[in-house]
Amino acid sequence: MDKQQLAKMIDHTILKPEADKASIEKLCKEALEYNFASVCINPTNVELAAKLLKGSEVKVCTVIGFPLGANTMEVKAFETKDAIAKGADEVDMVINIGRLKDKDYEYVEKDIKAVVDAADKKALTKVIIETCLLTEEEKVKACELAKKAGADFVKTSTGFSTGGATPEDIKLMRETVGPDMGVKASGGVRSIEDAEAVIKNGATRIGASASIAICEGKVSDSTY
């Protein structure tokens, strides 16, 4: 895989709360230079990013119910509609992890579907299951519920919890959702070796703040 192909699999990410206007402008400039799949930013920065990326192939991705997933489904649905109205092309939502652990699967599916329905095919929906907090059984169940609810992708992590993507989790997620659904690895992908390992195991998208280092074959210690 060459640098250009790899770049098209990466969501160039900055989700730090202290990200200012200059940070977003730099992120978008880099995304245009490398032709990354998208920039992934907090909702407050969607309008600016949409303006900076207008007319390019680079998509605007934002986060919903982030990073805890503990908002109500009504709030997540509103966030989704608002983000799309402001220019988002993709939304990465966090599941209700506590309800999953309660085995309240009906709620978890409805919560995901609320975002899928709010997106109304105007934006891709990615479902963050926060793998580091789940058992193997819970990871499988979360992926099954995301697929059943009609989401486009399952995603490993927020990057704000106790761990990120692992090749093993990506393999399990890919085996669970089958060949057609997207699988996004995020959190802890900081080198070309990390990227190749998750791609080999079934990732079709990578969320990273170390995107440039990955494409240039370097190692970064950067975090979201």
UniProtKB/Swiss-Prot annotation:
InterPro entries (alphabetical): Aldolase_TIM (IPR013785), DeoC (IPR011343), DeoC/FbaB/LacD_aldolase (IPR002915), DeoC_typeI (IPR028581)
Note the superkingdom of the native organism. Answer: Bacteria
Is Zinc tagged as a keyword? no
Q: Which GO terms describe its cellular component?
A: cytoplasm
- Please list the residues that make up the active site: D92 (proton donor/acceptor), K155 (schiff-base intermediate with acetaldehyde), K184 (proton donor/acceptor)
From the UniProt record, list the reaction(s) this protein catalyses: 2-deoxy-D-ribose 5-phosphate = D-glyceraldehyde 3-phosphate + acetaldehyde
One annotated GO molecular function is: deoxyribose-phosphate aldolase activity
The keyword Cytoplasm appears for this protein: yes
Q: Which UniProt keywords apply?
A: Cytoplasm, Lyase, Schiff base
Known pathway: Carbohydrate degradation; 2-deoxy-D-ribose 1-phosphate degradation; D-glyceraldehyde 3-phosphate and acetaldehyde from 2-deoxy-alpha-D-ribose 1-phosphate: step 2/2
Q: What is its main location?
A: cytoplasm
A Pfam family per the record: DeoC
Q: Where in the cell is it found?
A: Cytoplasm
Question: EC annotation?
Answer: 4.1.2.4
Q: Which GO BP annotation is one of this protein's?
A: carbohydrate catabolic process
Concerning PANTHER family, the annotation shows: DEOXYRIBOSE-PHOSPHATE ALDOLASE
Query: Which HAMAP family does the protein's record reference?
Result: DeoC_type1 (MF_00114)
NCBIfam families, A to Z: deoC
Family from the record: Belongs to the DeoC/FbaB aldolase family. DeoC type 1 subfamily.
What is the protein's known function? Catalyzes a reversible aldol reaction between acetaldehyde and D-glyceraldehyde 3-phosphate to generate 2-deoxy-D-ribose 5-phosphate.
Specify the protein name.
Answer: Deoxyribose-phosphate aldolase
Q: Which organism is it from?
A: Clostridium perfringens (strain ATCC 13124 / DSM 756 / JCM 1290 / NCIMB 6125 / NCTC 8237 / Type A)
